[in-house]
């Protein structure tokens, strides 16, 4: 690594930054946006997808998932994640930030069987309070792996080192 020149362990990697989230609201169409983003990623030859998005509830009462749907085969976004994995794309998905909410469980597409669902832990290896957990509706353990997610050193938009969760 050369300071200011090269940082990381994959200096020859190339990246596609694809945004599918509409920050103004939460509607089921956002699953369609996510699926379109994954389809685009596949069309340009992406090998690895990381996604911090997860859904379980939307802004309309008639479009709320139930925990019985956490089977990897019900939610559109979960089916699309499995299809991407079947095509050879390694897909990492956040377990979700619902650990302290009444939902508490992983969010979709984290329930998909063929993807890697990532949870968060503290520096003393305890589950971060916000991190979602499994089981899935069909009794699979999720998340698949965990990583430091509380009090992480990060660089902010101004280039300063600060701490954040996620």
Where are these regions (language model features)?
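Structural detector of well-ordered beta-strand residues that form the stable sheet scaffold
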Residues: 16, 50, 90-92, 117, ...
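Extracellular S/T/G-rich loop segment that most often corresponds to the catalytic His/Ser-adjacent loop
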Residues: 110-166
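Catalytic-core regions built around general acid/base machinery
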Residues: 72-88
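Short beta-alpha junctions and helix-cap segments that line functional grooves
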Residues: 3-4, 102-106, 129-132
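Short acidic, glycine-rich surface-loop motifs adjacent to enzyme active sites
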Residues: 39-71, 94
């Amino acid at each position: 690594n050369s300071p200011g020149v090269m940082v990381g362990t994959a200096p020859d990697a190339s990246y596609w930054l694809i945004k599918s989230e509409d920050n103004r609201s939460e509607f089921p169409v956002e699953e369609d946006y996510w699926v379109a983003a994954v389809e685009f990623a596949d069309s340009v030859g992406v090998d690895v997808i990381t996604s911090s998005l997860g859904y379980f509830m939307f802004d309309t009462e008639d479009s709320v998932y139930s925990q019985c749907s956490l089977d990897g085969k019900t939610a559109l976004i979960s089916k699309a994640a499995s299809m991407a994995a079947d095509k050879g794309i390694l897909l990492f998905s956040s377990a979700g930030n619902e650990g302290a909410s009444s939902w508490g469980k992983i969010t979709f597409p984290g329930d998909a069987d063929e993807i890697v669902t990532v949870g968060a832990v503290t520096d003393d290896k305890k589950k971060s309070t916000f991190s979602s957990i499994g089981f899935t509706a069909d009794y699979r353990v999720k998340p698949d792996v965990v990583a430091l997610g509380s009090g992480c050193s990060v660089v902010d938009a101004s280039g300063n080192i600060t701490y954040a969760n996620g």
